[in-house]
């Protein structure tokens, strides 16, 4: 696999290289001996260890089997796929516009049965109104100097909301109370968005919890993330959207979501927080 100019992907390759190096050291085998056993040129080991080349799935299997570290294979393979997808995702954002970015995960959304959302910055996307989407996407386009195909992006994102009403999809959503009060848009748009939360939480497919401000925290406020079944996590950072597929990392996000959900209030208590946010609009 050829090198990517993306700094995120480069960092991921270096991290994978460090893991390969640690596995090699723990095995007591030299790079020369590994290369000989694998039938590789010794320079290939150097490229993999130094992160200049991203290993293929077969490279990882061979490396780990020679080093007697087969248990590392699933996480390493997942990590290499994460590294590659980071770059592809960023390239799509920069070259193809926001509509394309909204459409990249449609098949994943349709296949997912249980969605888990933790939202510390924005409303969960299945419950966003078009007006709120416009405000968020406009700010995003301005900050990242992205193509402003906002109408098309709104249409693509809105189309995904049909999953709330179709099939056997379930949505577990946890929000920080501060999200209710962040003025991402004007008061009319915010009132409509907050009203949409009230409507959405009554759907049989939706569980909406809100972590009240001032709650004694068992787990700190963190970046917005979403979990798709138990297979994939997306984390939203300022510089990039990060894909996580390594099983042990996913397990940490599942644990984190469970703890955050345990700090939230639901039902009438959540409705009271939303109603108070509507009342606070001027």
Located regions from the model:
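A generic structural signal for short coil/turn motifs at secondary-structure boundaries
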Residues: 181-185
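Interdomain hinge/linker segments and adjacent boundary elements that couple functional modules
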Residues: 2-19, 26, 31-36, 42, ...
């Amino acid at each position: 696999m050829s090198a990517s100019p993306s700094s995120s992907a480069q960092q991921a390759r270096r991290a994978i290289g460090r893991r390969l190096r640690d596995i090699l050291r723990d095995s007591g085998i030299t790079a020369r001996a590994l290369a000989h056993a694998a039938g590789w040129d010794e320079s290939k080991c150097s490229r993999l260890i130094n992160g200049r080349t991203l290993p293929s799935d077969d490279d990882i299997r061979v490396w780990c089997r020679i080093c007697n570290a087969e248990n590392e294979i699933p996480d390493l393979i997942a990590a290499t796929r994460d590294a590659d997808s980071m770059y592809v995702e960023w390239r799509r954002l920069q070259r193809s516009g926001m509509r394309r970015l909204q459409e990249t995960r449609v098949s994943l959304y349709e296949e997912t049965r249980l969605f888990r959302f933790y939202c510390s910055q924005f409303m969960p996307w299945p419950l966003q109104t078009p007006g709120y989407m416009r405000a968020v996407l406009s700010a995003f386009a301005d900050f990242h100097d992205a193509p402003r195909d906002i109408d098309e992006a709104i249409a693509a994102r809105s189309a995904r909301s049909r999953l709330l009403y179709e099939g056997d999809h379930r949505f577990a959503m946890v929000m920080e109370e501060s999200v209710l009060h962040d003025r991402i848009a004007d008061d009319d748009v915010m009132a409509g968005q907050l009203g949409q939360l009230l409507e959405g939480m009554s759907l049989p497919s939706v569980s909406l919890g809100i972590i009240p401000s001032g709650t004694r925290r068992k787990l700190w406020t963190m970046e917005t993330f979403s979990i798709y079944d138990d297979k994939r996590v997306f984390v939203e950072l300022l510089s990039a959207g990060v894909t996580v597929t390594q099983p042990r990392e996913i397990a940490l996000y599942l644990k984190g979501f469970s703890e955050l959900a345990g700090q939230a209030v639901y039902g009438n208590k959540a409705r009271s927080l939303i109603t108070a946010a509507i009342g606070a609009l001027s």
